[in-house]
């Protein structure tokens, strides 16, 4: 089977309700600002509950940061996404390891001639994992948003073709104003 040109980047977390929706929505805006209309950005989860919705705190965080979440609906990762994606970015190394095996099986089943690694963890691309804020306060969701947004320039640099990425690589990563607050809280608790 001949390999189709892949134009989809997928962000993956556990339930597609907290982290990966934030990554999808932030990265989509960057791609639109770059004028890359043929590149499709989406997200999916490893274990998506039926009729699930974006987490209220994730939605509120995105709204607080100026993003629209009205049309977002969580979806389960499937063989089609595994086979048709240019890149799959998982929030953790454990998720990456699981998806690499799933993708390899899906590619073999689809009769793909070449099976290149296109499954990455956020830490491979940006230097740190994105841990799950589920069950924590809104400040934690804002912190996770800052981590995700801060890693986007590294993801652009490592995933997009050379001629494309030079058109738009943010001059500096978004800093997290909550990092100092978090360190202060940790020091106070110690």
Language model feature labels by segment:
Residues 2-84, 157-168:
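Conserved active-site segments centered on acidic
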Residues 87, 94-175, 179, 183-190:
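Phosphate-binding/catalytic loops
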